[in-house]
Swiss-Prot record:
Protein's UniProt keywords contain Zinc: no
Gene Ontology BP term (one): ubiquinone biosynthetic process
Superkingdom of origin: Bacteria
Gene behind this protein: ubiD
Protein name per UniProt: 3-octaprenyl-4-hydroxybenzoate carboxy-lyase
Cofactor binding: number and manner: Binds 1 prenylated FMN per subunit.
Quaternary structure (record): Homohexamer.
GO molecular function: 3-octaprenyl-4-hydroxybenzoate carboxy-lyase activity; metal ion binding
């Protein structure tokens, strides 16, 4: 599906019954979470809450929620019509990530066509962007005027969830786009919770080293178009900007606007011109903090694990200017025990990951991130095994190839006769093909999500790999079992007489 921006996407969803509007007052404090949780579990539509109300406070802007509550809407957001078509996006990314020399004129022509399509989607700058139709400055900057959700009863504060954070490191040609949650702590400050290994945190660290004591510029886009949001969580090759990739998905070049704050403009931070709301500001210096910059204690918040996370210290982002479209829409979500939107996104993006992994490891037959595994904490891999120890090579390959899987705790590898999408078959393979001492790999002191309270220390824990493949000589000295399979002729005979057997 092609579209121009978020509003065009919503209009198309509404025409097909994929979006509904709620005109009854609903509170962003807990009530929207409960409504959206019920919608998501029933594979219901996206929803626009037209009248957000929190007690006596009435908000001027509606709230969009449950946008990515089904895999079909995720696919539509990525320019596809179905989940199956996302494999084609993965093939495109794998070709862009590691292009191969053409083996003939036909392949050369395909390579040229692909390169031209990428080139044609280079983002373009616009001078009068919609995202700057309204500007709040000075005392007008007040985040309490935005209907930010408080998702769960034990949450510490309202939480910005779909903020597209735009940063640039001091030595980077390309901007980084990332989705990081942000706790609202007062009218113009949020706590920026980013993991130490993610792009935004790396840009900030490089800035602090290269420019100690200097404010770090940040822009946050709220209500960006789906392709740009999804591009930020997709393994885009370093040679391709997320904005350019979003244009490929959307079918139209991404329009960008230069931030109004002079220091952000000087840092060449560019934001989606069609975004609903833009936050502009800095992480300010603080000589009293060991990092040299302002930090605050974040959390606790209910998270995609299904638990409240422990508190930790993260940088404070001071918002100095807010720009927006006329009649802006605030895009929000919640996270909780699966299923939630991150789990749905994981199922959809799984189809993008498969061709990328297969390009690097052709022996991989299928790859699956079960939604019960909290998006990425468990991965299942089926493979065409070729030698003893092959499964362990694949385990370490998955952990190291894409940065999305550096936090994966469990990897189970099976043969290609096992259907990964059927837990009954996976459990059968584990219980019949695994000796726990021989076939379990434990790796200690590896990067782990800060939200994983099961790890011994924050951000550092262990990983487990389970080799549930049939064992080859060298892996066992015993005669290996042969699966029971019915004679094909007998099956065909019973098929032919089945309808008459019980008459």
């Amino acid at each position: 599906m092609q579209y121009r921006d978020l509003r065009d996407f919503l209009a198309q969803l509404e025409r097909t019954g994929e979006l509904r509007r709620v005109h009854q007052p609903v509170s962003p404090r807990l009530e929207m979470t409960e409504v959206c949780d019920r919608l998501l579990r029933s594979e219901g539509p996206a929803v626009v809450f037209a009248q957000p109300v929190d007690g006596a406070q009435k908000y001027d802007m509606p709230v969009l929620a449950n946008l990515f509550g089904t895999t079909r809407r995720v696919a539509l957001g990525m320019g596809a019509e179905s989940l199956d078509e996302l494999r084609d996006i993965g093939r495109l990314l794998s070709a862009l990530k590691e292009p191969e020399p053409p083996r003939g004129l036909r392949e050369a022509g395909k390579l040229w066509t692909m390169a031209k399509a990428v080139w044609d989607m280079a983002p373009r700058k616009v001078s009068s962007p919609a995202c700057q139709e309204i500007v709040w400055e000075g005392n007008d900057v007040d985040l309490s005027r935005i209907p930010v959700q408080t998702c769960w009863p034990g949450d510490a504060a309202p939480l910005v969830t779909w903020g597209l954070v735009i940063t640039r490191g001091p030595h980077k040609k390309r901007q980084n786009l990332g989705i990081y949650r942000q706790q609202v702590i007062n009218r113009n400050q949020v706590i920026m919770r980013w993991l130490a290994h993610r792009g935004g945190a790396l840009d900030f660290r490089e800035h602090a080293i290269a420019n100690p004591g200097q404010p770090f510029p940040i822009a946050v886009a709220l209500g960006a178009d789906p392709a740009t949001i999804l591009g930020a969580v997709t393994p885009v090759p370093d040679t391709l900007s997320e904005y350019q990739f979003a244009g490929l998905l959307r079918g139209s070049r991404t329009e960008l606007a230069t931030c109004l704050t002079p220091s952000l403009a000087q840092a060449q931070l560019q934001v989606p011109a069609g975004a609903e709301i833009i936050l502009e500001g800095h992480i300010q210096p603080d000589p009293t903090h060991p990092s040299g910059y302002q930090h605050a204690l974040e959390g606790p918040f209910g998270d995609h694990t299904g638990y409240y996370n422990e508190q930790d210290w993260f940088p404070v982002f001071t918002v100095e200017r807010i720009t927006m479209r006329r009649d802006p829409i605030y895009h929000s979500t919640y996270t909780g025990k699966p299923p939630d939107e991150p789990a749905v996104l994981g199922v959809a993006l799984n189809e993008v990951f498969v061709p990328l992994l297969q390009k690097q490891f052709p022996e991989i037959a299928d790859f699956y991130l079960p939604p019960e595994g909290c998006s990425y904490r468990m991965a299942l891999v089926s493979m065409k095994k070729q030698y003893a120890g092959h499964a362990k090579r694949v385990m370490f390959g998955v952990w190291s190839f894409l940065r999305q899987f550096m936090y994966t705790k469990f990897i189970v590898v099976v043969d290609d006769d096992v259907n990964l999408r059927d837990w009954k078959e996976v459990i059968w393979a584990i219980t019949t093909r695994v000796d726990p001492a021989r076939d379990t790999v434990m790796v200690e002191n590896t990067p782990i999500d800060y939200l994983d309270f099961a790890s011994p220390v924050s951000g550092l824990g262990s990983k487990m790999g389970i080799d549930a493949t049939n064992k080859w000589p060298g892996e066992t000295t015993r005669e290996w079992g042969q699966p029971i399979v019915m004679d094909t002729a007998v099956k065909a005979k019973v098929d032919a007489m089945w309808d008459t057997l019980f008459q």
